């Protein structure tokens, strides 16, 4: 057991320590330092590690145990919520407003959270990943207004969720469910949700032992990538189609 997190060199090709070496307290803290280059970020995700820190902190790298994971064919939407979708006119698209989604995730107030972990450097890092075809967004629209969304990173047949937002009740649920349906139909079985909270568990997330999560990641990231841009493949869907 390690009592201190590893210190990463700023050199982008410096390897991460094994995720199993993460601290028990705080749960999952593995390393400090490094940078947010695409090379570093992709190496992190491929190793079951993600960045999470606030403005003024150095990059902090995490791999908690247990890990929160969705099966892409098992998103729970309540009967009441599904009934409300029958009259919905909202539409859902992918990769048409990535920057707006990440900005909304950063700026939307959240209960129990002061400020945001999506710093300016983090924003630029994920915009670069999006330009390289790794980071993707799913967007929910009321007419032309963006009312909800989710973004994350796809490698092989694994999706690593990062954040979601909603300015209208239920829009983030629609974004997640639409993402999950799209992934399931394209043989992507898992969505990493990182750290548990009751909202995610209510939506069907499961707590996985880290070793099981890492085993799945190692297998799925080697499989064929989805296209670099999802907008055409995803198309435009009506939220009521989720019913």
Swiss-Prot record:
Name the chemical reaction catalysed here.
N-terminal L-lysyl-[protein] + L-leucyl-tRNA(Leu) = N-terminal L-leucyl-L-lysyl-[protein] + tRNA(Leu) + H(+); N-terminal L-arginyl-[protein] + L-leucyl-tRNA(Leu) = N-terminal L-leucyl-L-arginyl-[protein] + tRNA(Leu) + H(+); L-phenylalanyl-tRNA(Phe) + an N-terminal L-alpha-aminoacyl-[protein] = an N-terminal L-phenylalanyl-L-alpha-aminoacyl-[protein] + tRNA(Phe)
Q: Where is this region: Disordered?
A: 1-22
Q: Broadest EC class?
A: transferase
For whether the record's keyword set contains Cytoplasm, the answer is yes
Q: Name one Pfam family in it.
A: Leu_Phe_trans
What is the documented function of this protein? Functions in the N-end rule pathway of protein degradation where it conjugates Leu, Phe and, less efficiently, Met from aminoacyl-tRNAs to the N-termini of proteins containing an N-terminal arginine or lysine.
Q: What is the lineage of its organism?
A: Bacteria, Pseudomonadati, Pseudomonadota, Gammaproteobacteria, Lysobacterales
This protein is called: Leucyl/phenylalanyl-tRNA--protein transferase
| NCBIfam families, per database record | aat
Q: What keywords appear on the UniProt entry?
A: Acyltransferase, Cytoplasm, Transferase
């Amino acid at each position: 057991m390690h009592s201190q997190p590893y210190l990463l060199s700023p050199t982008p090709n410096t390897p991460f320590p094994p995720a199993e070496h993460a601290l028990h307290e705080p749960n999952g803290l593995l390393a400090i330092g490094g940078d947010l280059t695409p090379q570093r970020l992709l190496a992190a995700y491929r190793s079951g590690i993600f960045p999470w820190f606030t403005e003024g902190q150095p990059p902090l790298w995490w791999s908690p145990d247990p890990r929160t994971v969705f099966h892409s064919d098992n998103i729970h939407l309540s009967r009441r919520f599904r009934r409300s979708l029958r009259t919905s006119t909202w539409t859902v698209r992918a990769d048409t407003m990535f920057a707006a989604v990440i900005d909304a995730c950063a700026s939307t107030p959240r209960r129990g959270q002061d400020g945001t972990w999506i710093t300016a450097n983090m924003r630029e890092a994920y915009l670069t990943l999006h330009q390289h075809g790794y980071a993707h967004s799913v967007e929910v629209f009321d007419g032309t207004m963006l009312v909800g969304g989710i973004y994350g990173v796809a490698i092989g047949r694994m999706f690593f969720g990062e954040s979601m937002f909603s300015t209208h009740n239920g829009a983030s649920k629609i974004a997640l469910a639409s993402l999950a349906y799209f992934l399931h139909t394209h043989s992507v079985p898992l969505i990493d949700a990182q750290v548990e909270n009751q909202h995610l568990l209510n939506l069907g997330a499961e707590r996985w032992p880290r070793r099981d999560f890492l085993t799945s990641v190692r297998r799925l990231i080697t499989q064929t990538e989805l296209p670099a841009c999802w907008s055409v493949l995803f198309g435009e869907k009506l939220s009521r189609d989720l019913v």
